[in-house]
Amino acid sequence: MHNKFLLLILFLFIPNIMLGKNYMMNCISPDFKKAAFYKFDSTNKKLLMRTVKKKWKDFCDFDTEYEQNIDCTFNKLNIIRSSTIENEQDYLEKYLNINFTKYSLVETIKIFKNSNLKEKIDNIYKCKKVNI
């Protein structure tokens, strides 16, 4: 009797555990100045971001530092967020490659001066999986 009950419970709950639709990770910048949590809902294709002591915000709509042309591309568990930040003659192109299979985040910043590429910076964040 008890064995059948345990098998029934396992049969009901294991598919939900195995087919998890939400993924979460915590990432810290290489200089340890920025830290954020990232949560990805793969069924709704929604990426949420939360810094320490702040509320969850939709990362694909949220403007972090006067960004323009924010765009998110979803490819299974890999999300690429691109944006531009314009100054008078300069502008930045910022790309965030967030990978929930490897639990990694790579930030690529391209600095343009007078429409010419001046500098390219790659920041590899230290990320850790957070169990939900």
Regions inferred by a protein language model and the residue ranges of each:
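Disulfide-rich extracellular modules and peptides
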Residues: 29, 62, 74, 129-130
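Classical Sec-dependent N-terminal signal peptides that target proteins to the secretory pathway
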Residues: 1-21
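N-terminal glycine/threonine-rich, aromatic-flanked beta-hairpin/loop signature
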Residues: 35-65, 103-115
